[in-house]
Amino acid sequence: MRVTMSLEALTTEALAAIAAAQDLVALDQVRVQFTGKKSQLAEQSKALGKMDPEERKVQGAAIHAVRETINNALTERQTALQQAALAQKLASETIDITLPGRGQRVGTVHPVTQVQERICQFFTKAGFTVATGPEVEDDYHNFEALNIPGHHPARAMHDTFYFDANHLLRTHTSGVQIRTMETSQPPIRIVCPGRVYRCDSDQTHSPMFHQIEGLYVAENTSFAELKGLLINLLNEFFEKDLKVRFRPSYFPFTEPSAEVDIMDERGRWLEVLGCGMVHPNVLRAAGIDPDKYKGFAFGLGVERFAMLRYGINDLRMFYQNDVRFLRQFA
């Protein structure tokens, strides 16, 4: 009876100490005090061995009940203290959602690059492969192989940047077409985007600009197929059904040749690109039999397409690094 009363007093004291613990450190000290190896409860457990079996059974059950009561109280208090600590932490880290947000400025793709990618995507869906080549070109691939020999008057059409008598900054991406035909067998279906250079600078011309040229060589190509492809390109790029016309023109590397115009909202015809059937001399220079194969080619200025799509009247705006201008295309 004396031991049982002692256990009741121990339980009361332990529960009071647990309730008074204000943090987890203090609670752990209470746990050690009342359930540790040197606690009164542990001493009473050791004394069970000196009791007769019947008394040991009763007192052992009483000690177990007290230990379980204390442990349950410790667990509940620990949970309560942890929740209180978490609530305090959350309260101290509260975000004031009434504060105005701070916008993050992000970069974007340059409008010329956007237009170039848009055009190339159209042609890749049509089965074309994107091909690239050197910007520093030799005279042969830039002129000679394109049916423009040294004495040809068409060379006057190009204001060229020369490094020496045989090396220059390419004036078009047609050299990529020649290099591809030299190393590939028909059918050949490629588009060649890239920077080109001409000694010209004004509101509609730049010493450096971007061009996309296309080439299709096979046994049964036709001008009708070329027309259909380019009309589809223009309608998809400008997202409207356009009035399109093909005017006879002259390019030394195509025969027949044509320039393509579209009608704007004011009823004016605007030139957008050039095209034609590949000249037999060009096929022959690249090692392709012009009696067996035919081809068509076309070329367009990327900046020209961008100006028409976005209503820009000065090509130089693309390269003035004016962030106010460029942000409009983000």
Curated annotation (Swiss-Prot):
The keyword Lyase does not apply. Its EC number is 6.1.1.20. CDD domains: PheRS_alpha_core. It comes from the Bacteria. It holds the Pfam family Phe_tRNA-synt_N. It is an enzyme of class 6 (ligase). Its cofactor is Mg(2+). InterPro entries: aa-tRNA-synth_II, aa-tRNA-synth_II/BPL/LPL, Phe-tRNA-synth_IIc_asu, Phe-tRNA_ligase_II_N, Phe_tRNA_ligase_alpha1_bac, Phenylalanyl-tRNA_Synthase, tRNA-bd_arm. It is found in: Cytoplasm. One of its GO terms (molecular function) is phenylalanine-tRNA ligase activity. One of its GO terms (biological process) is phenylalanyl-tRNA aminoacylation. Belongs to the class-II aminoacyl-tRNA synthetase family. Phe-tRNA synthetase alpha subunit type 1 subfamily. PANTHER family: PHENYLALANINE--TRNA LIGASE, MITOCHONDRIAL, PHENYLALANYL-TRNA SYNTHETASE. This is Phenylalanine--tRNA ligase alpha subunit. It comes from Acinetobacter baumannii (strain SDF).
